[in-house]
């Protein structure tokens, strides 16, 4: 049928529990880093527990914020873009639409991606995104 766009939250089953095999899903874009509400009492309690266990400055490896919020957020984002390519013969576009995935800085999440993914992803400026996607589909011999 005609091309379609699905917009959903990263907290729903469409980004984790549905298998889009074959050409059912050609691309996925995660806009932002899906960190949950940091002000909720539960979130603050979990963060505090991790801070007490590992040290607020990450002495034990990671801070409470990283362990309670950042790591699960990056895991959710990776799970969502993983919906695109489910087998060795599938191709698709996977995009993280947030500079924090690409650059090294105090608020970067790049270090939470596996090394192979860090190498695979290519930062693209917004004005070149359309061109980059067209070039990708041309290179794999598919018109999407």
Each predicted region: which residue ranges?
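ASCE RecA-like P-loop NTPase motor cores
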Residues: 1-144
């Amino acid at each position: 049928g005609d091309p379609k766009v699905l917009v959903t939250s990263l907290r729903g089953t469409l980004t984790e529990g549905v298998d889009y095999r074959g050409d059912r899903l050609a691309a996925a874009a995660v806009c932002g880093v899906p960190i949950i509400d940091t002000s909720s009492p539960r979130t603050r309690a979990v963060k505090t527990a991790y801070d007490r266990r590992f040290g607020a400055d990450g002495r034990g490896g990671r801070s409470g914020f990283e362990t309670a919020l950042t790591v699960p957020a990056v895991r959710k984002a990776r799970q969502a873009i993983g919906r695109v390519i489910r087998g060795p013969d599938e191709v698709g576009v996977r995009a993280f639409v947030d500079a924090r995935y690409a650059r090294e800085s105090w608020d970067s999440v790049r270090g939470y991606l596996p090394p192979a993914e860090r190498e695979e992803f290519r930062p693209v400026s917004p004005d070149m995104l359309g061109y980059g996607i067209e070039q990708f589909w041309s290179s794999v011999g598919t018109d999407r």
